[in-house]
Amino acid sequence: MALAYDGAIQRLIDSFASLPGIGPKGAQRIAFYLLQAPDAESQRLVDAINEVKEKVRFCEVCGNVCESSPCTICSDPRRDHGTICVVEEPKDVMSIERTREYRGLYQVLGGAINPMANVGPSDLNIAQLLNRLHDGEVKEIIVALNPNIEGEATTTYLSRLLAPLDIKVTRLASGLPVGGDLEYADEITLSRALEGRREV
C-alpha cells in the first residue's frame, strides 16, 4: 500500500499530479515548495488562478482564449480576413503567432478527432468554422494540426467537408516531426512550414 501524507498536503499533491505534464514527484516538489514559500508568493498563485477562471473565456468567433470577445486577433482590421488557420488548441495560436509570418485569422477546434477517446467531429468547433465561411470572404483555410494520427484524421475530415466549397484548403509543409506538437516547434520550423504549405 502506498504511503500518503496527511490531509491537506496530500490533497494539494494530488491536485498538482492531476495536471497535464506533472507526475507524482513533480507534484510533491511543487507542493512542498509552496508550503515553504512566503505567503505573498502563494497568494499570488491563488490570485492568478482565480483571475484566469473569472476573466478568461473563449472567443465567440474563433474559439481562442481571450478576456473580451471577440478576441484581439479577430477584431484586428489589419489581419487578413480571407485566410483562416485551423489549429487544435489556443497554445497552437501562440506558437504560430511567434513566427510573425502569419497575418490571417484562426479557428481553434478544441482538440482533434480521436475515436479512442470518444472525440468525434461534433465535439470540436467545426460548426463554428463552417459558420464563418458563408459570406464568401474566406479564400483559404490552412490546416495546421499536430502531425499525429488524430491530426491526420481531422485534416482528412476537414478536407472532405470543405471540398464542395470554393475555398482553397492547404496544410503545413513537412518539417514538423510526425507525432510532434506545434507547441514545441521552433519559430523557424513553423515559418518554413507555413511558407511551404500545400493543397490538401
Curated annotation (Swiss-Prot):
Keywords: DNA damage, DNA recombination, DNA repair, Metal-binding, Zinc, Zinc-finger. GO terms for biological process: DNA recombination; DNA repair. GO terms for molecular function: DNA binding; zinc ion binding. The keyword Metal-binding applies. CDD domains: TOPRIM_recR (cd01025). A zinc finger (C4-type) spans 59-74. Residues 82-177 form the Toprim domain. It comes from the Bacteria. SUPFAM superfamilies: Recombination protein RecR. The keyword tRNA processing does not apply. InterPro entries: DNA_Rcmb_RecR, Rcmb_RecR, Rcmb_RecR_Znf, TOPRIM_dom, TOPRIM_RecR. May play a role in DNA repair. It seems to be involved in an RecBC-independent recombinational process of DNA repair. It may act with RecF and RecO. Belongs to the RecR family. This is Recombination protein RecR. The lineage of its organism: Bacteria, Bacillati, Actinomycetota, Actinomycetes, Bifidobacteriales.
